[in-house]
Amino acid sequence: MTLDSYNIFNDEYLFNMPLSPLPKVLGNFETGQSVLTLTTPTLTPTTTRNIEDTLGHLLSDTQTDRVAGCAGFAVPKVLPNAMGAIDALGMGIPTCVSSLPLQQTYDASLGQGSESEDSNASYNDTQMNEEQDTTDTSSAHTDSTSYQAGHIMVGSVNGGGVNNFTNVLAAVSSSRGSASVGSSNANTSNPPARRGGGRRPNRSTNMTPEEEQKRAVRRERNKQAAARCRKRRVDQTNELTEEVEQLEKRRDSMRKEFEALTNSKKQLEYLLATHRSTCQKIRSDILSVATCNGLIAPDGLLSAGSSGSAASSHHNHNSNDSSNGTITGMDATLNSTGRSNSPLDLKPAANIDSLLLHIKDEPLDGAIDSGSSLDQDGPPPSKRITLPPMSTMPHVHLSTLITPTGASSGSLQTPITSTAPVGFGSAFPVTSNGSSINNINSIGNSMNSPTLNALNKVPKERPNTLAFQRPLGQMHLTMANNKAGGPTQIQGVPIQTPSTGTFNFDSLMDGGTGLTPVSGPLVPNSSSTNKHPLELPTPTAEPSKLVSL
C-alpha cells in the first residue's frame, strides 16, 4: 500500500481549507516543479542572485507574517508537549523526530524550486496559488514531504482522517520552526515581500531605464492593438446587427405588400366571376357589327334592305366566326378564349367594281346626295334627276335644248356629260304640256332597264371612292385666254348669244341667266313647278332645262 491511496491528501480535501497555512507553504515548494520547461536552465550571476533572494525571503518568513497573511486569524502554535499528547493517543507516531534530515530535504526542495522559478519567471506566487491548487503535483509533494518528515504515516492505519491531518500540520510547523532557527545566523536580511499582479513579476529594481522604457512602449502598443481589435469586433458586430435589422424590416414590408397584392388578386377574381355573364351578353349583343359587301354597316340598314331576293345576293358576311355575319372580336381583351383573332377582312367584294361604275358624278356645289348619306336627319330634300348621255338618247335633239334669252334670238347649247344614276324615281317632278312630256317619258322608258330596277332595290350605301370631273378649270382657262371678248365656248360648245361679254361674276353666281355651265347631271328642284321670271316660254312650248346654282 502506497501513500497515494489515501484520499485525505488530495487537493479537494487539503487545499480548500482557507484558514490553513499549508497551501501557501506547499505552493512555494512547487513553484517551478509543476510546469515543464522547454529550455535547460543556465546558472548565471543574475540567476544566482535571484536564488539567494528567494531563499532569504522564504527562510525569514516568521510566524507573525504568516498570521498577518491569514486575515487576522492566529494559528495555534504546536508545542513539544502536543507531540507527546499525540503519541499518547496511540497513533503510533514516534516522538523523536530528527531535524537534520528534514532541514536537508527542505533546503534541497527550496534550491530546486528556486532554479526552476527563474526559468519560468512568467508565473508569480499569486497566480500559482490560484492555478495550481487543483493539480496532482500538490498531493504528490504533500506525500513526499510527509514521508520525508520523519515517516509520519507509519502507524496511521487505525487512525481517522481528522487526526491524520492534524499530525501533518504539526509536522510541518515543527519543521519550519527548526529550519528558521538553524538559518537565523546565516541570513539576517529581511527583503520586502514580492507583490506582483501581472503576467510577469515586478523586478523594476534589476532593470535598466532603457529596458523599462521598452517595456512601457511595448505595453502601450499592446494595449492599443487590443483596443483596436476589440473596437473592430464591436463594429463588425454592430454592422451585422444593423444588416439583420434592415433585412427583417424588408421582409416585413415585402410580407405586407404580398398580402395586399393577394387581397387585390382575390377581389379582381371575384369581380371577374360576377361579371362573366354580363360580359357574355355584351359580347353577343352590343359588340355585334354586321358587314355588307366587305364594309361595316349598321344592322338597321341591312334589315331594311334584306327583303328582296336580289339584294340578299349582294351581301357578303365577313366576320371572325363563320357561323353568323356579326363581328364579335372588336376588342381582343373581350375574347373569352384569350387568343388573338385574325384581323378583319374589309376588302370590297368583286361586284363593288360594277357598282362603282354607276355612281354619279359629284355636282359643282359640293352637295351630298341625300340617298347616299347614312347619318342624315330630318326630311329628305327634293330628288335630283340624272339624265343619260346625249349619245344614248334616241329621240332628243339638240334643237330642243336651245333656250332663248329674252328678246335675243341666240341660244345656249348646254352639253350634258354624266354616267348612269345610282337611283331615281319613276316619274319626274316636272309637269308641262306638249311634246316635251312625251320626250321625257320616252327618256324615262329607255332608262327603265332590269339592271337599274335591281339597283333601285338595293339600299344605298356611302361609296368609298368618288370619280368626278371638274370642267370648271377648263372654263377658267378659256376665260383667261379670251379676256377681251369674254368666254365664247364651254367644253368646245360655242355660246351663241349676243350678250356673252356683258355678264360679270355676280351675275354668274346669281344664276338663271342661261350662261351657267353645267357638267354634271341636271337636277331640277322643287321650284321648277313655279315658273321662274327668266324662264320665258319658247315657240315650241318646251319648258326650260336650265339649272341655277
UniProtKB/Swiss-Prot annotation:
Signal peptide: none annotated. It is found in: Nucleus. Residues 108-127, 333-343 have a biased composition (Polar residues). Disulfide bonds: none annotated. Residues 108-143, 177-234, 304-345, 367-389, 510-549 are annotated as: Disordered. The keyword Transcription regulation applies. GO terms for biological process: embryo development ending in birth or egg hatching. Residues 240-247 are annotated as: Leucine-zipper. Pfam families: bZIP_1 (PF00170). One of its GO terms (cellular component) is nucleus. The modification Phosphoserine is found at residue 342. GO terms for molecular function: DNA binding; DNA-binding transcription factor activity, RNA polymerase II-specific; RNA polymerase II cis-regulatory region sequence-specific DNA binding. Residues 212-275 form the bZIP domain. Homodimer. Heterodimer with Jra. The kay-Jra heterodimer binds more stably to the AP-1 site than either of the two proteins alone. Belongs to the bZIP family. Fos subfamily. Developmentally regulated transcription factor AP-1 binds and recognizes the enhancer DNA sequence: 5'-TGA[CG]TCA-3'. May play a role in the function or determination of a particular subset of cells in the developing embryo. It is able to carry out its function either independently of or in conjunction with Jra. PANTHER family: ACTIVATING TRANSCRIPTION FACTOR 3-RELATED, FOS TRANSCRIPTION FACTOR-RELATED. This is Transcription factor kayak. It comes from Drosophila sechellia. The gene is kay.
